[in-house]
């Protein structure tokens, strides 16, 4: 009964956040989150989950070119995870982001006071990002990859790869954490 009530309240809370987030379907919000949307757009797919303390920022300095933060279907944003977007952050379907993760596609300031440089981040489908990982600007994380806890990702990660460390290094090829399918097994065998 208690679990059912928790899910109902999460869906109702998700409906309340529709004024700041465009949602393709029902999104569960399991507690208070921080959404800042200035000259930008935040899009969520169907059946996503957002956990307490998450911070979603889509903040463009230019009204003509708005920032776009997109999260695909069935993805999960963990407790206290922060996603900062000045240009474009794209998160695919079935992505699991653990708690305290930072996804930062820009430096918060630039040396000498010039314009802040932002570079898009792409996190492809079926990626699992471990606790307290940091994903920095200009990175693409390939389909089915796993990012280890505490990793600092500064370079692209190929599909079906485990990456960890500071800075993150590609450690080994992996099978998809989502389960097995013909495509996943063929990819992992390469």
Task: Please identify what each model-predicted range represents.
Residues 162:
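Short glycine-centered segments of the SAM/dcSAM-binding site in methyltransferase folds
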Residues 67, 87, 119-120, 131, ...:
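Glycine/small-residue-rich pyrophosphate-binding loop that anchors the diphosphate of NDP-sugar donors
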């Amino acid at each position: 009964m208690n679990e059912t009530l928790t899910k109902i309240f999460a869906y109702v809370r998700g409906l309340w956040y529709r004024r700041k987030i465009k949602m393709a379907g029902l999104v569960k919000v399991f507690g208070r989150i921080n959404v800042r949307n200035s000259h930008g757009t935040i899009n969520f797919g169907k059946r996503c989950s957002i956990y307490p303390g998450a911070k979603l920022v889509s903040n463009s300095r230019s009204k003509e070119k708005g920032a776009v933060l997109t999260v695909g279907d069935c993805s999960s944003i963990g407790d206290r995870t922060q996603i900062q977007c000045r240009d474009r952050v794209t998160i695919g379907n079935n992505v699991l982001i653990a708690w305290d993760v930072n996804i930062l596609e820009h430096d918060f300031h630039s040396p000498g006071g010039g314009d802040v440089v932002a570079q898009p981040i792409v996190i492809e489908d079926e990626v699992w990002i471990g606790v307290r990982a940091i994903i920095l600007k200009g990175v693409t994380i390939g389909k089915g990859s796993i990012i280890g806890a505490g990793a600092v990702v500064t370079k692209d990660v190929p599909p079906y790869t485990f990456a960890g460390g500071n800075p993150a290094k590609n450690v080994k090829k992996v099978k998809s954490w989502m389960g097995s399918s013909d495509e996943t097994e063929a990819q992992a065998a390469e």
